[in-house]
């Protein structure tokens, strides 16, 4: 869909661009403020995709992502990057719904 505002009388039509082969049942997704990284959340894990220079999203989503584990949560439902795109916030649908922060720079250092 277009990222710029459209006239309210205009019908926006979404088109499937590609299938993402790495997981099933996505529950949330967010893009970094610079538009170069995406995080996709499932009930069990998060997946971080980083675009290469001049790469489109369909091709970026075909590459193997970095897996992010959120062991303390059950049925993760919502995900968001922090303001600068250096951390990810995740919460679950179970009450009480804790908010977990993952520092992406630290997760890059883990084996």
Task: Describe the residue ranges of each PLM region.
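Sequence/structural signature of beta-propeller domains
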Residues: 1-111
